[in-house]
């Protein structure tokens, strides 16, 4: 084979590989929009200190997906009040977020009790079923199911779980969960930055059952136990 023919063959092969890579990117990455983003910015002027209310729940399973044994979060739509399987939400810059998390999952001892300390919220407290607490010690009492942690804003919230044996033996079996199942109600507030940006949040309890060290699966998948808060101006 002559040199020009070999060069032409290599160019054709290179273009074919490039075309294949482009197809994969477009059809398998860009075509997938991922979980929706719930918008809490309507009728709120950014950077005025106004407040928005975000309601979430964590569930011990995800029966609305093809991974029913994965633990997950849901966000309640501010427009329809339906539970949406997503962990992405949008809030105004320079505002106060009043968050409520319904804790339907059972207790899991924290690997490191540092995740049981509340940080980054208004007053560095949360309200568990109406009771103000600054620490949940999962080593002395099985009282924590998951966490809501946003490292870039210094936020760490241990999400309380039902503590009784009876409650932990009768957890919600279909998601999204309903108030008839054992649960806790965790409330707290935090302030958003005045500068727009994307802030990653996740659960710090290794709850990916069946994955190495519990850190795979739902723990690293947007829409389950990790997500993004979009702060918009």
Q: Which sequence ranges carry the predicted segments?
A:
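Extracytoplasmic entry segments of secretory-pathway proteins
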Residues: 1-140, 150, 233
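Extracellular/periplasmic metallocenter environments
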Residues: 18, 22-31, 123-233
């Amino acid at each position: 084979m002559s040199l020009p023919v070999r060069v032409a063959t290599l160019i054709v092969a290179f273009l074919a590989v490039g075309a294949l890579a482009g197809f994969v990117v477009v059809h398998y990455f860009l075509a997938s929009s991922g979980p929706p983003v719930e918008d809490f910015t309507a009728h709120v002027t950014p950077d005025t200190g106004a407040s928005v209310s975000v309601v979430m729940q964590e569930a011990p399973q995800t029966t609305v997906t093809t991974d029913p044994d994965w633990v997950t979060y849901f966000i309640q739509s501010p427009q329809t009040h339906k539970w949406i399987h997503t962990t992405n939400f949008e809030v105004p810059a320079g505002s106060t977020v009043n968050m409520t998390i319904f804790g339907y999952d059972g207790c899991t001892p924290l690997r490191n009790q540092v995740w049981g300390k509340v940080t980054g919220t208004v007053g560095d407290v949360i309200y568990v079923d109406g009771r103000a607490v600054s620490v949940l010690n999962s080593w002395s009492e099985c009282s924590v199911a998951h966490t809501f942690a946003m490292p870039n804003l210094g936020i760490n919230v241990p999400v309380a779980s039902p503590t009784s044996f009876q409650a932990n033996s009768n957890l919600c079996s279909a998601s999204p969960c309903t108030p008839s199942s054992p649960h806790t109600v965790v409330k707290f507030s935090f302030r958003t930055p005045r500068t727009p940006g994307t802030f990653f949040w996740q659960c710090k309890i290794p709850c990916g059952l069946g994955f190495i060290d519990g850190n795979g699966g739902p723990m690293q998948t947007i829409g389950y136990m990790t997500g993004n808060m979009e702060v918009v101006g």
